[in-house]
Regions:
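Bacterial N-terminal signal peptides that target proteins for export
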Residues: 1-8
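Bacterial N-terminal signal peptides
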Residues: 9-17
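Sec/Tat signal peptide C-region and signal peptidase I cleavage site
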Residues: 19-23
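Catalytic glycan-binding domains that act on GlcNAc-containing polysaccharides
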Residues: 24-147
Length: 147
């Protein structure tokens, strides 16, 4: 019985030390959304989506970032859950600054690790995007980011 206890304690200690090291690495590599600079990504997305035209329209998507009514509703649901009184309107999609605010709000909730790839693909294909279906869009945005 004593040997089993020693083995279990050893396994537990090993697990805790690996877990602790992993947490330290994550805290070093990950920057919170409020500190992460999404501006280059947003500007590249704007160029791909609308070439910077705030009056751009394509189906239900409008504005520089081609925001849909569903995304506006999701942003308002997030704000409601956060007990914020702020709400977005459908006309806010035509505002460059409010479009960027909605993008940042979505990243803060659905992309807490600030993955640029996830942000780009989710903007094109939704939160449950298909890598295959978003590949061309991802490459377009990344090519602009590399310039």
């Amino acid at each position: 019985m004593n040997r089993i206890t020693k083995v279990l304690v050893s396994i537990l200690m090993l697990t805790l030390s690996v877990s602790s090291a992993s947490a330290e690495t994550n805290s070093i590599n990950n920057v919170s959304s409020s500190e992460f600079d999404w501006n280059p990504v947003m500007e590249a997305i704007i160029q791909v989506e609308s070439e910077g035209n705030p009056k751009a329209k394509s189906g239900n998507s409008v504005g520089v970032m081609q925001i849909t009514p569903i995304l506006v509703a999701e942003c308002n649901n997030i704000l409601k859950k956060k007990k914020s009184k702020k709400r977005y309107t459908l006309s806010d999609r035509y505002s460059i600054s409010k479009s960027k605010e909605m993008f940042l709000l979505m990243q803060s909730v659905y992309n807490p690790l600030n993955s640029i790839e996830q942000a780009i693909r989710a903007w094109n294909g939704g939160n449950h995007f298909s890598v295959k279906k978003t590949q061309r869009y991802f490459e377009k945005v990344m090519n602009l980011l590399k310039k």
